[in-house]
């Protein structure tokens, strides 16, 4: 009974700790950080292509990113569940 509580406390600590370590810091995406570094290294750099769709706001962009991740997770876990069910069925025969 102690082990699950210790693991739960560790997970909660890992979730809360970043807020205290970087208090007042700004959270930004890796794309924006990469873009700023490219501008420092090569100010005359021109992108090879433009995005097919540019979301109207950051909230819509976050929504699309979340939907993409959720769909990917659903596909992966469906495949894992299907494979496990198939393996159990084959083990019974």
Swiss-Prot record:
One of its GO terms (biological process) is cobalamin biosynthetic process. Keywords: Cell inner membrane, Cell membrane, Cobalamin biosynthesis, Cobalt, Cobalt transport, Ion transport, Membrane, Transmembrane, Transmembrane helix, Transport. One of its GO terms (molecular function) is cobalt ion transmembrane transporter activity. GO terms for cellular component: plasma membrane. The keyword Ribosomal protein does not apply. It is a multi-pass membrane protein. The chain crosses the membrane at residues 5-25, 63-83. It is found in: Cell inner membrane. Pathway: Cofactor biosynthesis; adenosylcobalamin biosynthesis. The keyword Zinc does not apply. Its main location: membrane. It comes from the Bacteria. InterPro entries: CbiN (IPR003705). Part of the energy-coupling factor (ECF) transporter complex CbiMNOQ involved in cobalt import. Belongs to the CbiN family. Forms an energy-coupling factor (ECF) transporter complex composed of an ATP-binding protein (A component, CbiO), a transmembrane protein (T component, CbiQ) and 2 possible substrate-capture proteins (S components, CbiM and CbiN) of unknown stoichimetry. This is Cobalt transport protein CbiN.
């Amino acid at each position: 009974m102690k082990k699950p509580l210790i693991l739960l406390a560790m997970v909660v600590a890992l979730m809360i700790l970043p807020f205290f370590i970087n208090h007042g810091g700004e959270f930004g995406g890796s794309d924006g950080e990469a873009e700023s570094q490219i501008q420092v290294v090569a100010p005359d750099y021109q992108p090879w292509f433009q995005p097919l769709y540019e979301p109207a706001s950051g909230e819509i962009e976050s929504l699309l990113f979340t939907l993409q991740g959720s769909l990917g997770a659903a596909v992966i876990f469906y495949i894992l569940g299907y494979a496990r069910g198939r393996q159990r069925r084959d083990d019974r025969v």
